[in-house]
């Protein structure tokens, strides 16, 4: 888990101005005041959406402004209200007022709504200022300004996809290839000493979070290697991507590596090993023995697990893998009616 944080500006619509007008009718040379009121400004509402996974979209669009109300008109006509806007945020987003530090709202359930900036009231037209002794008032009010706030949005990110596999199976290299994360990468075990998380951006501002879980070794469920604490990080992921080095450089058997990791997951938690999983053969650019790849493919097929071949160095298979992950963890985008 890590904290994603963005700062945004929200501005509700100003109210429309009240109108200064008088009745103009035939045979009524001195008609009374008829200025209508200004319309109310639109609100800015934050809406908790299951279709939002991260705060990435706010980095591209940090300002959100509702429409101002229309001005009042003669004949006591009130101006139209400004259009309000809804701004989607992910479940788990906490909203703070940047100026005061006050915690304004904590979104926990899809569909929750919070009006974060209210539109300004429309100004009164001159019809409201007439009295028995003041029958031709020229007073009229400007609209009230809509609320404007600078907000800090904070999201505790849980990974949608957990990358598991032996040390140096290529997890850190893959996450650096498909996201903006820059984990430490080197050719020795336990380069990754804590989970790295990266946000993977897809088309249409959709995104999901991938966690590069530190290398699991035999005995991890008992605390060996980097221990049990890192297995806990993948308990709440929606998909496991099991990376297996199929090159000869490792000096290891890909099938045996796969089986050992599966045993460690099962010993830690039955629910963990039952999670949706895909199998990813890594380092295909330096894999010289096709039999090693085929053996792993056959094993994945026997367990009814999708199988992918990639090279993070050359980009082979990366796009197909990204889309396969997205298809499994992102909710379908609703089609407008």
UniProtKB/Swiss-Prot annotation:
Residue ranges annotated for the OBG-type G domain, each copy included? 159-330
Give the domain of life.
Bacteria
EC nos = 3.6.5.-
Q: Could you give a single Gene Ontology term from the biological process aspect?
A: ribosome biogenesis
Q: Where are the transmembrane segments?
A: none
Q: What is its main location?
A: cytoplasm
Q: Which GO terms describe its molecular function?
A: GTP binding; GTPase activity; magnesium ion binding
Per UniProt, GTP binds at 165-172, 190-194, 212-215, 282-285, 311-313
InterPro entries found in the cross-reference section: G_OBG, GTP-bd, GTP-bd_Obg/CgtA, GTP1-OBG_CS, GTP1_OBG_dom, GTP1_OBG_dom_sf, OBG_GTPase, P-loop_NTPase
The answer to whether the entry has keyword Repressor is no
Bias (Basic and acidic residues) occurs at: 61-74, 137-146
Quote the CDD domains the UniProt record gives: Obg
Please state every residue range assigned to the domain named Obg: 1-158
Task: Check the record and name the HAMAP family matching this protein.
Answer: GTPase_Obg (MF_01454)
Q: Which family is it part of?
A: Belongs to the TRAFAC class OBG-HflX-like GTPase superfamily. OBG GTPase family.
Q: What is this protein called?
A: GTPase Obg
- Source organism of the structure: Solibacter usitatus (strain Ellin6076)
Organism lineage: Bacteria, Pseudomonadati, Acidobacteriota, Terriglobia, Bryobacterales
UniProt lists the gene as obg
């Amino acid at each position: 888990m890590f904290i994603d944080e963005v700062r945004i500006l929200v501005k509700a619509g100003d109210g429309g101005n009240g109108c200064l007008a008088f009745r103009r009718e035939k045979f009524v040379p001195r008609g009374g005041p008829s200025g209508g009121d200004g319309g109310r400004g639109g609100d800015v509402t934050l809406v908790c959406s299951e279709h939002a996974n991260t705060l990435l979209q706010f980095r591209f669009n940090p300002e959100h402004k509702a429409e101002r109300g229309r001005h009042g008109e003669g004949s006591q006509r009130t101006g139209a209200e400004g259009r309000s806007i809804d701004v989607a945020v992910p479940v788990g987003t906490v909203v703070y007022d940047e100026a005061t530090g006050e915690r304004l709202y904590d979104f926990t359930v899809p569909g929750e709504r919070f009006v974060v900036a209210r539109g300004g009231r429309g100004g009164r037209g001159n019809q409201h200022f007439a009295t028995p002794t003041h029958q031709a008032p020229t007073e009229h009010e400007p609209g009230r300004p809509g609320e404007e706030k600078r907000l800090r949005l904070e999201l505790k990110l849980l990974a949608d996809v957990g990358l598991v596999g032996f040390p140096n199976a290529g997890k850190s290299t893959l996450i650096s290839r498909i996201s903006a994360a820059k984990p430490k990468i080197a050719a020795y075990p336990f380069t990754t000493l804590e989970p790295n998380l990266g946000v993977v951006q897809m088309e249409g501002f959709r995104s999901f979070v991938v966690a590069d879980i530190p290398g699991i070794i035999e005995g991890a469920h008992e605390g060996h290697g980097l221990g049990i604490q890192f297995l806990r990080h993948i308990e709440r992921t929606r998909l496991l991507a099991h990376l297996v080095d199929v090159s000869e450089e490792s000096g290891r058997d890909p099938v045996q590596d796969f089986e050992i990791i599966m045993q460690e997951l099962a010993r830690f938690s039955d629910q963990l090993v039952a999670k949706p999983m895909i199998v990813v053969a890594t380092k295909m650019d330096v894999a010289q023995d096709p039999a090693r790849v085929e053996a792993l493919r056959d094993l994945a097929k026997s367990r009814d697990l999708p199988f992918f071949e990639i090279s993070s160095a050359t980009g082979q298979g990366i796009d197909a893998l990204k889309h396969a992950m997205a298809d499994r963890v992102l909710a379908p985008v609703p089609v407008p009616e």
